[in-house]
Amino acid sequence: MRVNSRNIAYHELIGLEVRILQYPDPSLVGLKGKVVDETLKTLVIETPSGRRVRIFKFNSILEFMLPDGEAVVIKGSTIIGRPWDRLKMVSR
């Protein structure tokens, strides 16, 4: 299944480019990078300089760049959960 704006909440996020649009820590707003790890409640983003930042999904608004170039804005609360459990939630 290819990732698109309709299924991003159920798709693998590792490897996607991301930008933080809203976050409780204002110093992280605007941070861009690639998702390199994901847990139940967090994402690890690697910036172009190689710095890794762990952020909580809850209370964040994120913009993901899909492989086809489309930008998708999503609330972090919609992607809370273990990656493999979210993948199981896809309707067949």
From Swiss-Prot:
SMART domains: POP4 (SM00538). One of its GO terms (biological process) is tRNA 5'-leader removal. The keyword Nuclease applies. It is found in: Cytoplasm. It catalyses: Endonucleolytic cleavage of RNA, removing 5'-extranucleotides from tRNA precursor. It is an enzyme of class 3 (hydrolase). One of its GO terms (molecular function) is RNA binding. GO terms for cellular component: cytoplasm; ribonuclease P complex. The keyword Iron-sulfur does not apply. Its EC number is 3.1.26.5. Belongs to the eukaryotic/archaeal RNase P protein component 1 family. Part of ribonuclease P, a protein complex that generates mature tRNA molecules by cleaving their 5'-ends. Consists of a catalytic RNA component and at least 4-5 protein subunits. This is Ribonuclease P protein component 1. It comes from Desulfurococcus amylolyticus (strain DSM 18924 / JCM 16383 / VKM B-2413 / 1221n). The gene is rnp1.
